[in-house]
């Protein structure tokens, strides 16, 4: 896991606007939020991470980490029971920040659904986990 963290996964979102998916009702393709790092400030910093928490990119990062764990940590191959818990909280954070019927919630939900479908090489999270661990 240290290898994953050394990659500084949040850095890939620095300077990247949150642009709604084309299929997001009423706002398809529009920029919903942006974060501009201050000049001469490192990114990611605490301010940026607070911004990231209120975007679907937070869930995307969690699922990238889960994918890393599934591929690299040999879960289910030892004598002890392994447990992988995935908590996708961005939907909750975004809902509280922007309201349950906001375009931000719609876009976050669509992205979370898409990202869950693509988790694992087989294309479906449940199939990937079932194939790997039974």
What are these regions (language model features)?
Residues 53, 106-107:
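Short, contiguous strand/loop micro-motifs
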Residues 1-80, 89-96:
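His/Asp/Glu-rich, glycine-adjacent segments
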Residues 62-65, 69, 108, 112-119:
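Alpha-helical packing segments of well-folded alpha/beta enzyme cores
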Residues 111-134:
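Metal-dependent active-site segment of extracytoplasmic phospho-/sulfohydrolases and closely related
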Residues 82-87, 132:
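Structural recognition of the beta-strand scaffold that forms the well-ordered cores
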Residues 96-98, 117:
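Extended acidic, low-complexity intrinsically disordered regions
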Residues 76, 102, 125-128:
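Helix N-terminus capping/helix-initiation residues
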Residues 98-106:
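Short secondary-structure boundary/capping segments
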């Amino acid at each position: 896991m240290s290898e994953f963290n050394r990659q500084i996964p949040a850095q890939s979102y620095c300077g990247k606007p949150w642009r709604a998916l084309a299929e997001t009702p009423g706002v398809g393709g529009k920029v919903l939020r942006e974060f501009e790092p201050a000049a001469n400030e490192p990114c990611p910093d605490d301010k940026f991470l607070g911004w990231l928490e209120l975007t679907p990119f937070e869930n995307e990062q969690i699922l990238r980490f889960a994918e890393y764990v599934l591929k690299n940590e040999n879960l289910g191959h030892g004598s002890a029971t392994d447990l992988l818990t995935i908590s996708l909280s961005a939907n909750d954070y975004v809902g509280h920040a922007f309201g349950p019927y906001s375009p931000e919630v719609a876009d976050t939900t669509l992205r979370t659904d898409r990202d869950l479908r693509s988790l694992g090489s087989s294309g479906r999270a449940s199939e990937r986990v079932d194939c790997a661990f039974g």
